[in-house]
Amino acid sequence: MSAYFILTQTVTDPQKYSEEYIPGVMPFLQKYKADVLVADFEASPLQGDPAKGVVVLRFPSEQAIRDLLDDPAYQPLKKLRLSITANANAVMAPEFKMPG
């Protein structure tokens, strides 16, 4: 069953994010078979005061998300992402299947 990784964050260094993080993370997204459904620096808030950066990724499973996040080769990119963002919140959720 598919699983979704949902991240909200404020990107504090858009140039570094675009030029270093995004190209660096793409091979990991391919390796773990992630589909990028949403990637936006300026999402429109509808309620509350959320961070404007939103990323939604679909993975084949929750384990694939954990495997990417735990991949030793990903750790330098994670450190980079955390250094150029603020207010980051991430959740993982399984795909919803309508009962019946």
Where do the PLM segments sit?
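Short S/T/G/P-rich N-terminal loop/turn motif that feeds into the first structured element of a domain
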Residues: 1-53, 59-70, 94-100
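C-terminal structural segments of small proteins and small subunits
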Residues: 65-92
